[in-house]
């Protein structure tokens, strides 16, 4: 991505984007062989509840740990923390947003708190959820950005609630641990998009990078699934006009 520095000298910011690593299943070694300035982790990297249930006080991520002596979820939590440590060393800046799987088996907003706390341990790892980070005069803004469920279509929400695991294994932050509902994610979609709009519209003279987990266009749907209108509503939103109206958005 090209960006312009305050001294008017042109420079190029190199950004590497990865997502859906699902480290709960196996480790992935991300290298910075391209000498990128920023690594974007755009969701489905780890599960926050494993981090919460197994704090690093029970072991040190800076010492050699025999994974065979750890329980499965404790080993997974160690893997998550070691991954963040490695990418923080490999890349000058790391921008991370949660995907839907980050919330699995935990509470919705509490999971965000757990992830934010873990990222804050590293000075160059920034967790975004309706907030922003300026890197070399480029604005990074975003969050999970759930979809609008086919523009808040009731049939889409009814069907997806019974099909997707999200609405069985993610709990809301209330006393009775009720399941997350599609209408909840639609409200969060609106809130996140409103925040992105606010930041981007207030910075028309800047270069903006929007970071989210879910796709901003149905054009991203694989050819195999392009006619699955209801299910696609859980993965994509039609934000093409939003993007085209804002030329300061250089990357999404």
List each model region and its residues.
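A structural motif corresponding to the C-terminal end of an alpha-helix
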Residues: 86-93, 121-125, 195-207, 241-251
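Beta-strand-turn-beta hairpins that frame and shape the catalytic cleft
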Residues: 11-15, 132-142
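Conserved beta-sheet core of the metallophosphoesterase superfamily
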Residues: 93-96, 116, 215-252
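Short amphipathic alpha-helices and their capping/turn segments at secondary-structure boundaries
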Residues: 26-34, 82-88, 127-136, 192-206
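N-terminal active-site segment of His-dependent metallophosphoesterases
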Residues: 2-96, 103-110, 175-179
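Active-site neighborhood of phospho(di)ester-bond hydrolases with catalytic His/Asp-centered motifs
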Residues: 17-19, 39-44, 95-100, 126-130, ...
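Active-site environment of divalent metal-dependent phosphoester hydrolases
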Residues: 23-28, 46-51, 101-111, 132-134, ...
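Active-site-proximal loop/helix segment associated with metal-binding centers of metalloenzymes
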Residues: 141-209, 214-230
């Amino acid at each position: 991505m090209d960006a312009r520095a305050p001294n008017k000298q042109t420079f190029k910011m190199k950004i590497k984007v990865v997502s859906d690593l699902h480290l709960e299943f196996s480790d992935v070694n991300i290298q910075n062989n391209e000498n990128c300035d920023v690594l974007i982790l755009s969701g489905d990297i780890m599960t926050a509840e494993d981090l919460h249930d197994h704090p690093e006080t029970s072991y040190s991520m800076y010492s050699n740990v025999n994974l065979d002596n750890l329980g499965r979820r404790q080993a997974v939590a160690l893997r998550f923390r070691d991954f963040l440590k490695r990418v923080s060393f490999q890349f000058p800046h790391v921008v991370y947003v949660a995907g839907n799987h980050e919330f699995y088996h935990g509470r919705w907003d509490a999971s965000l708190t757990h992830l934010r706390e873990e990222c804050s341990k590293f000075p160059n790892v920034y967790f975004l959820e309706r907030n922003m980070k300026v890197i070399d005069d480029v604005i990074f803004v975003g969050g999970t950005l759930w979809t609008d469920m086919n523009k808040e279509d009731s049939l889409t929400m009814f069907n997806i609630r019974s099909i997707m695991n999200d609405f069985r294994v993610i709990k809301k932050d209330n006393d009775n641990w009720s399941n997350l509902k599609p209408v909840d994610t639609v409200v969060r979609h609106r809130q996140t998009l409103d925040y992105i709009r606010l930041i981007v519209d207030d910075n028309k003279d800047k270069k903006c990078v929007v970071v989210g987990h879910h796709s901003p266009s149905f054009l991203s749907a694989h050819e195999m699934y392009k006619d699955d209108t209801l299910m696609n509503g859980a993965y994509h939103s039609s934000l093409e006009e939003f993007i085209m109206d804002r030329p300061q958005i250089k990357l999404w």
